[in-house]
Each structure stands twice: as C-alpha cells, then as structure tokens.
C-alpha cells in the first residue's frame, strides 16, 4: 500500500505537470478515498474544524446530487465543501473585493460511475499563481506552501 506522503507527493506532482487541451494546468489535486462520500465529507470537515484555533472553518456544503434529484435528474454524489480561514482571506478581500467570487476555497467529494469516491481541490500554487493575480493581487509562495500543507493534512485525514 502506498504511503500517505508518497501518495500526496504524486498527487501534487501530477497536478503540477503541464497538460494539453482545455484542462491545461488545471491546478486540481484529486485523491482517492477509502471511505464513502458521507464519511469522507465528515472526516474532511472534522479535520478543518480541528484547526479552528488557527482560524479555519467550514462555511457550508453544496449537494449537487440532491439539487439534481429535486429537479427530476440523476447525478452521482457531488458535494462541494466551502471552507477557509478568514484570518488570511479577509485582508486580501479588503484589497480586492472581487476576490470574493473565487474564495473561500472549495473541496469536492464525488463518486465516479464505478462507485469510487474522490476528493478534489485546487492547489495553493494555482490559487496564488492564477486566482490572486486575476484580481490584481500579488502571488505569495509562502501562503501557497502553507495552504498546501494544510490541505495535505485535511485530505489525508479525510481519505486515509
């Protein structure tokens, strides 16, 4: 069985590779979960809440499958978790109000057609190199690294 660190390193490496077509440099990190969608969500949110003393919090969940069902459509599980740290995000939004359309960060817990559960989120490098500059904010490699370290912790708690 692949170690957590190796699995994380491979995920980050693959997300950083140049890609072709419309998905070029997507910045997405996707990790398999050994748990159900519900348990993966619970574990991811618990990991975030465990760091509330550092300012991290879960804002809400968006259940796309439930919305589809209410409209007579079928969709495998697709739940977006909106989470963040107002201590770090608020100062940036004070400088550029339009940043609020792209943050707080999100994670997607989803199930593929074969029933496998996945956790997907943006890398810190993507947020710092593409999202922040889009709003006229400078890239901050230190913040990107800290965000990636936090997400490594939360993702491992959720999926392993």
What are these regions (language model features)?
Residues 18-20:
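N-terminal signal peptide c-region/cleavage motif recognized by signal peptidases
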Residues 106-137:
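Beta-strand/loop substructures that line and gate deep hydrophobic ligand-binding cavities in soluble
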